[in-house]
């Protein structure tokens, strides 16, 4: 089976070729893009399908052999530096390949229905193919230079896709915000890469890990400098995976079409940061301060994301903050050294979140004919309610994703999240309790989203007062090519968690996920549990999840929302201590924890003030000097012009006098 490893480079090449074909088609047939829609979708899906088949082949080979294969070619070779290009096939890259290609296929099939009436249909498929190719190339990268190149391509594609509807001012601002915020992390990542090259003299992952460990053991490296370089490396994933304090771009990225929201939040951009931390974890584990920083950043992000999601009215923004929170869980697990558990939650969350985002897109698609095509209404849960009656398949699949994300057994995220909590309680109890409390908040806001959207009475007809071009029959179920991916993603959302179920019989473990996932050296793994031990340790997490769901049912359940108007239902303003608490929570959530306002008043306003200062300096000082020199030349020329009399004898007289004067001056000096 090692023969298939030699063709691993074809996996990112196929979607890259489809993007190239679509780009040539757009340039060659600008007036005929409508007739090329079916062909563009077929090409994109077919080429990514080839990549998916190769990915499954590599995945199966890793299950059987559990060995890494690296293929490297010389790229740039000089006396000072040697750069190589290649790809690595190991359990981490193989499972990420399967994740990216399967979610990517589902998103592309879904896109055919969701974007069917959009003028940028072909362009969107082009961006999707390029985005997928960039992520696949990042996953296969064998060194830091190569991974940085694909890292930047992923950021560029996210900029193009978030700002896909660039005619909307909000979308244009969102893509700029995402791009600029990620520049901060990318700059730190670049400095970290250069720092570790300075320390180890290599960009290769394996070489860096080996040399860095040797240098630490022999005290031949400045530990403080190594810590700074590691934190700079970590700054890249902090921005890309929307970790505090560089998380502010993620909710605004919802301005892009819903299919790209699913791809970004499940398998590409935000997953890239987790993947890079997992790849670099053997380096980070040599530095306990860095590991503690990763864990604290993760749990802080998890709690912050959960609190910000509590009162969101926009369906997609609520799910966006949920992604931010769950990524914090993954960072927490990696910071604790639980390599397998962090990756396990990455996988289970990816399928669950892809299902939820595509389900939200189905809801929005069904709401638009009723409430209008303004996203402020079609995505507002205040105008939803009772949609399960109109869209039963979407409602059932969305409920499956909700149960999984809340950690309700036996759905996928239950197994991974519960192991994260168990490891946190064992290694850093204070972080474990914070993560446990966050699990309760997760169940509350996810069931709040579900109840507001799918249960109770439909409130969308309120929009008729503001929009005359509405459909009085209510929402409708989406087309087959949109519903089919929801059903398909429901399967791994339910069953993939059993790969990590703790089935321990005697001393032989049948924990399938741990059997083949190779753990790099120095990783500290949690001990495996029996069914009884796991069930007992699961009671607190399941209990807090059920409690959060019950509170959401009491406040937002069908009985609470039935026959209540929109303002009364969602307005938290009440008198008394309870009202003050509710108002505080709502303001914290709706105003994004005041973090965006803080950034606007400090960094953004400060940067603009400095820019204005430089503008004034450039306009009045730099340009003033240049312009004044020109004016002096002009005035000088004008003044000497009047001294010209037009006689040659006068000019010769002035020349002779000047020459003798200069000779006399130099003679006196000597």
UniProtKB/Swiss-Prot annotation:
Enzyme class, UniProt record, top EC level: translocase
Database matches in InterPro entries: NADH_UbQ_OxRdtase_chlpt_su5_C (IPR002128), NADHpl_OxRdtase_5_subgr (IPR018393), ND/Mrp_TM (IPR001750), NU5C-like (IPR003945), Proton_antipo_N (IPR001516)
One family name in Pfam for this protein: Proton_antipo_M
Domain of life: Eukaryota
Molecular function in Gene Ontology: NADH dehydrogenase (ubiquinone) activity; quinone binding
Single biological process term from Gene Ontology: ATP synthesis coupled electron transport
Compartments reported by the entry: Plastid, Chloroplast thylakoid membrane
GO annotation, cellular component aspect: chloroplast thylakoid membrane
Catalytic activity: a plastoquinone + NADH + (n+1) H(+)(in) = a plastoquinol + NAD(+) + n H(+)(out); a plastoquinone + NADPH + (n+1) H(+)(in) = a plastoquinol + NADP(+) + n H(+)(out)
Membrane topology listed for this record: Multi-pass membrane protein
Keywords: Chloroplast, Membrane, NAD, NADP, Plastid, Plastoquinone, Quinone, Thylakoid, Translocase, Transmembrane, Transmembrane helix, Transport
EC number(s) stated in the UniProt entry for this protein: 7.1.1.-
Chief subcellular location: plastid
Subunit structure: NDH is composed of at least 16 different subunits, 5 of which are encoded in the nucleus.
Function according to Swiss-Prot or TrEMBL: NDH shuttles electrons from NAD(P)H:plastoquinone, via FMN and iron-sulfur (Fe-S) centers, to quinones in the photosynthetic chain and possibly in a chloroplast respiratory chain. The immediate electron acceptor for the enzyme in this species is believed to be plastoquinone. Couples the redox reaction to proton translocation, and thus conserves the redox energy in a proton gradient.
Family the entry assigns: Belongs to the complex I subunit 5 family.
Cross-referenced PANTHER family: NADH-UBIQUINONE OXIDOREDUCTASE CHAIN 5 (PTHR42829:SF2)
Protein name per the record: NAD(P)H-quinone oxidoreductase subunit 5, chloroplastic
């Amino acid at each position: 089976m090692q023969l298939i490893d030699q063709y691993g480079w074809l996996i990112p090449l196929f979607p890259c070729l489809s993007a190239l074909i679509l780009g040539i088609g757009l340039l060659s047939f600008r007036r005929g893009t409508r007739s090329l829609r079916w062909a563009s979708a077929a090409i994109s899906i077919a080429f990514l399908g080839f990549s998916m088949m190769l990915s499954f082949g590599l995945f199966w080979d890793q299950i059987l052999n559990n060995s890494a294969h690296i293929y490297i070619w010389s790229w740039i070779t000089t006396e000072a530096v040697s750069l190589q290009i290649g790809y690595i096939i190991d359990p981490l890259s193989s499972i990420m390949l399967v994740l990216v290609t399967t979610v990517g296929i589902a998103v592309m099939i879904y896109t055919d229905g969701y974007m069917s009436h959009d003028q940028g249909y072909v362009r969107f498929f082009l961006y999707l193919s390029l985005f997928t190719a960039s992520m696949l190339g990042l996953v296969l990268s064998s060194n830091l230079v190569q991974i940085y190149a694909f890292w930047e391509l992923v950021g560029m594609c996210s900029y193009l896709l978030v700002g896909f509807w660039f005619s909307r001012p909000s979308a244009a601002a969102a893509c700029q915000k995402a791009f600029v915020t990620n520049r901060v992390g990318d700059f730190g990542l670049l400095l970290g890469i250069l720092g570790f090259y300075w320390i180890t003299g290599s960009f290769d992952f394996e070489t860096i890990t080996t040399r860095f460990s040797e240098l630490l053991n022999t005290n031949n490296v400045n530990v403080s400098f190594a810590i700074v370089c590691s934190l700079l490396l970590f700054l890249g994933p902090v921005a890309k995976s929307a970790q505090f304090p560089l998380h502010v771009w993620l909710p605004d990225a919802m301005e892009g079409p819903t299919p790209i929201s699913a791809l970004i939040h499940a398998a590409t951009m935000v997953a890239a940061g987790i993947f890079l931390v997992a790849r670099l974890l053997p380096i980070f584990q040599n530095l306990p301060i860095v590991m503690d920083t990763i864990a604290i950043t993760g749990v802080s992000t998890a709690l912050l994301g959960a609190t910000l999601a509590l009162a969101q009215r926009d369906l997609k923004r609520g799910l966006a903050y949920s992604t931010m929170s769950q990524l914090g869980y993954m960072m927490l697990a990696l910071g604790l050294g639980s390599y397998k558990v962090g990756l396990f939650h990455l996988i289970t969350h990816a399928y669950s979140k892809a299902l939820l985002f595509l389900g939200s897109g189905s809801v929005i698609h069904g709401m638009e004919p009723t409430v209008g095509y303004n996203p402020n209404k079609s995505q507002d849960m205040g105008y939803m309610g009772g949609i399960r009656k109109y869209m039963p398949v979407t409602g059932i699949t969305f409920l499956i994703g909700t149960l999984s994300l809340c950690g309700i057994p036996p759905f996928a995220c239950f197994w991974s999240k519960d192991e994260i909590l168990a490891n946190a309680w064992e290694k850093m109890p204070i972080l474990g309790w914070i993560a446990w409390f966050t699990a309760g908040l997760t169940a509350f806001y996810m069931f709040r989203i579900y109840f507001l959207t799918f249960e109770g009475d439909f409130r969308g007809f309120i929009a008729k007062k503001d929009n005359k071009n509405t459909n009085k029959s209510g929402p409708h179920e989406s087309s087959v090519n949109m519903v089919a991916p929801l059903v398909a993603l429901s399967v791994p959302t339910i069953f993939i968690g059993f790969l990590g179920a703790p089935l321990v019989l005697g001393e032989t473990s049948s924990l399938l996920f741990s059997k083949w996932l190779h753990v790099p050296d120095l990783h500290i793994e949690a001990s495996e549990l029996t069914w009884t031990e796991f069930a007992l340790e699961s009671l607190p997490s399941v209990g807090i999840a059920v409690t959060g769901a019950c509170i959401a049912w009491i406040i937002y359940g069908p009985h609470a929302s039935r026959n209540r108007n929109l303002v009364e239902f969602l307005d938290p303003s009440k008198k008394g201590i309870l009202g003050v608490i509710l108002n505080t929570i709502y303001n914290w959530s709706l105003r994004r924890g005041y973090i965006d306002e803080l950034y606007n008043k400090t960094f953004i306003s400060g940067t603009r003030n400095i820019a204005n200062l430089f503008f004034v300096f450039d306009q009045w000082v730099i340009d003033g000097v240049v312009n004044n020199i020109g004016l002096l030349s002009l005035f000088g020329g004008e003044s000497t012009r009047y001294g010209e009399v037009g006689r040659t004898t006068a000019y010769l007289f002035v020349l002779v006098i000047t020459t003798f004067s200069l000779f006399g001056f130099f003679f006196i000096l000597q």
